[in-house]
């Protein structure tokens, strides 16, 4: 994982992932226990002065790790849906999956010189 960035950036990222999850379930994300926990935890560990707080850094690291997990799960599901085996594929579909196109014969199918 790269540098952590700001806690507010991590918090907004977590809320974005909660919105993606709630869109799948149909419930508003603000009604979930995860949303209430995140807001409560980030408010409790908010630093108002320039003091260093180990608990805030631990919370930020755990939140960034959880954000990485949620993003990875969402991307995995999208890739799985796109490339999951659907039985036997045609040659054109298989070529399209890897970004290739098959050559076309000038006279159409069955063309002979």
From Swiss-Prot:
Highest taxon of source:
Eukaryota
Q: Where is this region: Disordered?
A: 94-113
Task: Please name the Pfam families in this protein's record.
Answer: Complex1_LYR_2 (PF13233)
Q: Does the keyword Mitochondrion apply?
A: yes
A GO cellular component annotation in the UniProt record:
mitochondrion
Q: What UniProt keywords apply to this chain's record, in alphabetical order?
A: Mitochondrion
| Principal localisation | mitochondrion
Q: Which InterPro entries match?
A: FMC1_homologue
Which PANTHER family does the record cross-reference, listed alphabetically? Answer: PROTEIN FMC1 HOMOLOG
Assembly notes: Interacts with ATPAF2.
Report the family membership: Belongs to the FMC1 family.
| Free-text function comment from the UniProt entry | Plays a role in the assembly/stability of the mitochondrial membrane ATP synthase (F(1)F(0) ATP synthase or Complex V).
Q: What is this protein called?
A: Protein FMC1 homolog
Q: Which gene encodes it?
A: FMC1
């Amino acid at each position: 994982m790269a540098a952590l960035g700001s806690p507010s950036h991590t918090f907004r990222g977590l809320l974005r992932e909660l919105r993606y999850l709630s869109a799948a379930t149909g419930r508003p994300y603000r009604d979930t226990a995860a949303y209430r926990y995140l807001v409560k935890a980030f408010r409790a560990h908010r630093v108002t002065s320039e003091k260093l707080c180990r608990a805030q850094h631990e919370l930020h690291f755990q939140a960034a790790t959880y954000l990485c997990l949620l993003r990875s799960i969402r991307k995995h599901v999208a890739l799985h849906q796109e490339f999951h085996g659907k039985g036997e594929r045609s040659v054109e579909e298989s070529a399209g999956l890897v970004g290739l196109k098959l050559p076309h014969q000038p006279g159409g199918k069955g063309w002979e010189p």
